[in-house]
Amino acid sequence: PTNNRWKEYYRVIANANNILKLIDPSSEDPANLKYRAIALGFRGYAYLQLSYLYQHSYYTGADGTKWGRGEKYDFSQSPCVPLITEDTEGDQPRATVAQIYEQIKSDLTTAFDLFKGLNMTRTSSATDMDGCVVAMHLARANMVIHEWDEAIKYAQVVIDNFPILQSEDQILQGFSNISLPDVVFGSDITADNSTTYMSFFSQMDTYGDGYAGIGVWRAAFKPLVDRIADTDIRLQWFCCDRSTGVTDASGNRITLIRDTQSPVAVEYQAVKFIGTGRDNIKAGVFSGWELGDYIYLRSEEAYMIKMEALAHKGSAEAVTELNSFMKTRQPDYNYTFTNKADLIEEIIYQKRVEFWGEGLEYIDNRRLNIPVDRTDETWGAENNNHFSAGKFRYNQEDRPFLYQLPLSEIENNSQLSPSDQN
């Protein structure tokens, strides 16, 4: 329900506002500066998340791409969500998208500057809200509003502080350990805080006893995987004939779940996320799937934001950045520039593979005007492994992408009426 997301992010905003009310903004006390930075960082993040859901993107589309501009394109003056800060009194109407982004940038840039002044650009713990976490969200926000130089600036902060995953062991670990070198922000999951069957790994881990392991299979879109090169390590995230196919004693081809002798439940079944970690699976240990750490931000995103922003600017450096990144996934990768639109499409495709199952495609589709197209007419019935109800096409300016405002908000906020509903 859309009410869940609304409450989640406004709870973050309320907590941040309560902290900010207690701190004198002119205070130079390091403890006060730290807590002010943390509160502003979380508030900016929460408004950014709300902006993705309750209105169309600031701009739908960008010039020089295959997808172009949406029909309306500029939603900056459209109503978004109520803007509430520590100084706000009384009910508030829906602020415009532009007003929300002004607040996002103000909160996050102030937080970043405070963290930098406190030598907290990167702290020792991946669970900390710090300067790099804020920088990643600033990079995301600036991509939405086409501030390419600012996006590069803040992406570079993360790049300067974090490597990307390099080895096959790291890339295939299972994304369940916040000690991985690319983890910018995450949560340490233990027996005390695991939600077990309500957890991320219950939903995504093929090897566990959660939903994804006992019948609610997670599979990737066939055309997405079929485009991955044989030499790309990431192909091994998906079980298909090219990655885990074998010939049985009868001469029949079967696809196995990676690192096991068990056949897949469905072709293209995903094994990217492994709660207990791949080393345990290879050793025959399948327990502990519910203890996988949550990884919220990975450094690879900053590298890909930078290369995309460079491409939008028409910089040849974008190809250099893309090739450098991709050689860690596919050693024989070598992209040759033809035109800007194709380059941006290639970057977005590789980003979609890299972050499969991590939620970034939704954000990128919104800001780049990429339709969600799962129809047989486009892909061919033989290539479309979506179930029938999932075979649809929507453009980014279509209503299904707009979350509804909770009825409780409309009923209890004196500045809203039913006519304010999306």
Where would I find each of the regions flagged by the language model?
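Alpha-helical solenoid scaffolds that mediate protein-protein interactions
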Residues: 19, 23, 50-51, 111, ...
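Inward-facing hydrophobic residues that define packing positions of alpha-helical scaffold repeats
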Residues: 13-16, 101, 108, 155, ...
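Conserved, well-structured interaction surfaces
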Residues: 1-56, 95, 113-115, 288-294, ...
